Amino acid sequence: MTEKKAPFGNNFTPEQRAAALKRAAELRAARAEYLVRVKSGEVSITDALEAGKGDPVVGRIKAKRLLMALPGVGAAKAQSAMTAIGIAESRRVAGIGQRQAEKLIELFG
């Protein structure tokens, strides 16, 4: 008989799948912990944008989520700033350009 394939071509063994799920959970927890540090004011927007260029944990955070973690910034303010600056909804911190970063620092720094 032919072997039944997993949907979408995931050919992981159960051990590989478990390891990948564990790693994904660790990364999500690390991103959440970083956002808590941003929310508390321990990390500034300048620090976060700089860290996003080199740290894959920070770089994978959605830009809007980072802005919403800033003290005093909610969904509406984050969205209007992103629209004004020209940052796409799907953009992650690592993908923010230098000029966009400068404008974010000007607004929220």
Task: Give residue spans per PLM region.
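Structure-specific DNA junction-binding interface
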Residues: 1-65, 69, 76, 80-109
